[in-house]
């Protein structure tokens, strides 16, 4: 299955979580310090992953992932 590629803030957090839980990876294009970066989100064996250019974040709970998506600006307000 091809990843869902979105711009930061294009989809709401629930839509992103639904895509992840259905088995899709989500690639979020975001801008940081005047350059474009891609963050890859995935869900595997009950764990959510946010693979950024500088580190890999893990979230065990759905609520934690929702908070991360909103806090980092990956999801729409």
Where are these regions (language model features)?
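Negatively charged, low-complexity tracts enriched in Asp/Glu with abundant Ser/Thr
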Residues: 1-32
